[in-house]
Amino acid sequence: MLRRVHPAPHERVTVAEAYTVERVPHEHRPWVGLCMVTSLDGTVAVGGASGGLGNPNDLQVLLTLRSITDVIVVGAGTVRGEGYGPPKKPGQRIGVVTNRGSVDLDDELFTSGAGFLIAPADADVDDDRVEVLRAGREVVDLRVAIERLHEIVPAVRYVQAEGGPTLNAALLEADLIDELDLTVASRLSGGAGPRLTRGADEIDRRFDLAHLLVDDDGFVFGRWTRRR
């Protein structure tokens, strides 16, 4: 259970109650949420992975959001660093964003048929071994890719992005983030770890606070939606 700080009334709620709210897709593309965890000083990975930052409630948030997601979109580096495998939700697909096609197609994520690639038109990828959604040249055009996800999952309504920071920055620049589900861990990490968006131009995107929750470990769980 978590304690709701915003909106009133201030009461205990379950993760499912807080996060399984309706998301309405856009006319020409699905709703895109970004789910991340960060330290108090902004690091999103410790030792190359985000798992060391979270706690059981943060994991429950991630799993709850995945349970209502049609497609997970994640960068190739995050897939390698976090050890992504096939999703637990039947029929769910995982789109791996790569500009160069440098992924291991023998990984179970792809051999299971759950994983597919999102790559530029000129990326060196064996289309006979893996399903590929091509958008852009040299670098992925994420807006085009998100708008064409229905070619992979016809009924797609909700997409969850899970990093890493380079993908987050590209989504930010393309103004594709409709929702930010951000856990702030009650710890400082120091070091030179990556921040939430790496390499993005300076941008002012405004969001509205949908809820703010806290747990007994001092973790803060926020959900913001894009002000449009």
Regions found by a protein language model. Give the residues of each.
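Enzymes that bind and transform nitrogen-containing heteroaromatic metabolites
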Residues: 1-228
